[in-house]
Structures are given as C-alpha cells and as structure tokens.
Amino acid sequence: MFLVDWFYGVLASLGLWQKDAKILFLGLDNAGKTTLLHMLKDERLVQHQPTQYPTSEELSIGNIKFKAFDLGGHQIARRVWRDYYAKVDAVVYLVDANDRERFPEAKKELDGLLSDESLTNVPFLILGNKIDIPYAASEDELRYHLGLTGVTTGKGNINLAGTNVRPIEVFMCSIVRKMGYGEGFKWMSQYIK
C-alpha cells in the first residue's frame, strides 16, 4: 500500500493526477531520458546502456494513466521518432547541459521537432540535465544555444487558451540529484488536456 500511496503522490506532485497522457522522451544519446523514466517509475538510479530500441512504460493506478516512450537518442534511433508522433500529448526533450560540443546537434534535432506539423500544438518541456556537474551550462546559456531566447512561454500558470501559442519552456535539472524536473512536469501538466 505504501508504494501505491507514494506513486499517487509522485504523479499528483507532477500534476499528472487524473490525466491520460502520452509523453515522448526525446533528446540526444546520453542526455538522461532512460534515467528520468526510471526515476519517475520507481526512483531507481542505475547505470543504463544506451537505448537501442524504443521502450515504453505504462503506469496505472486508479484513474491515472501515464504512458511514456523512451525512443533513444543515437542517430539511428532518431529516425523512428516520427513514428510515435500520433496522438502525443507532450514532448520532454532532454539536453545534456554539460556537453556544449553537442548543443548545435541538439538544436538541430529540436528545430526539426518544433517545425514538424504533426507536433504543432504539442507542449514541449525542455530539460537541461546534469546541472550537478561543475561548469554545466546555465539556463540562459542553454536557451541561447537552442535558439529559445525570447521564444518560451513563461514559467508558472500561463493561460494560453484561445491562442495559437505552443507551450514551450526550459527547466534546468539534475536527475541523479532528483531536482528541477518536478517543476518542469508541473508546468507541462497544465497544458495536457
């Protein structure tokens, strides 16, 4: 029973209580997608091999249905991302904030996602991960390199009803330290219908 109560608390704190959501976890390889999925599932931190094949986790307790797809981030895996866009409710795009050399590649992939017509109105939560590592990029630096300066929606409860504005925001996090991503999911949940 403790596990059920704990899991309810996690989803409620992330704003996903009583919502059905199909969420894609995307980003380059080694950004932390699988680690985040396992932290959300059972707060387990383990070393992962690179994701070779798409995986999904469907978590259900009471009225909660949360289906997350971890599609891998290496170049071959990115070719199948498009196959999962149908009926997606949100995209969580992870970026390794400590790997500045790959910011241009991360921007290119993000630009491709943002310009895809099948994702036009889908909320995007951008997580700059690994801020626990010294000299990781700041939020402003990451926004700049991803071309998101002045483009994001704004944090907090922003009402976008009746507009054609896509919800998109950057949150910095450390999955291994369990910090930052909760605020991002709370923000994203307000835009999941």
Curated annotation (Swiss-Prot):
Coiled-coil intervals, chain numbering: none
GO (cellular component) term, any one: Golgi apparatus
Matching InterPro entries: P-loop_NTPase, Small_GTP-bd, Small_GTPase_ARF/SAR, Small_GTPase_SAR1
Example GO molecular function: GTP binding
Subcellular location: Endoplasmic reticulum; Golgi apparatus
Keyword line: Endoplasmic reticulum, ER-Golgi transport, Golgi apparatus, GTP-binding, Nucleotide-binding, Protein transport, Transport
Residues noted as binding GTP in the record, renumbered to the chain: 27-34, 70-73, 129-132
Alphabetized SMART domains for the sequence: ARF (SM00177), SAR (SM00178)
Record bears the keyword Nucleotide-binding: yes
Swiss-Prot/TrEMBL GO biological process terms: endoplasmic reticulum to Golgi vesicle-mediated transport; intracellular protein transport; membrane organization; regulation of COPII vesicle coating; vesicle organization
Gene3D superfamilies associated with the record: P-loop containing nucleotide triphosphate hydrolases
Domain of life of the native organism: Eukaryota
Keyword GTP-binding: yes
Family: Belongs to the small GTPase superfamily. SAR1 family.
Record function comment: Involved in transport from the endoplasmic reticulum to the Golgi apparatus.
Protein's name in the database: GTP-binding protein SAR2
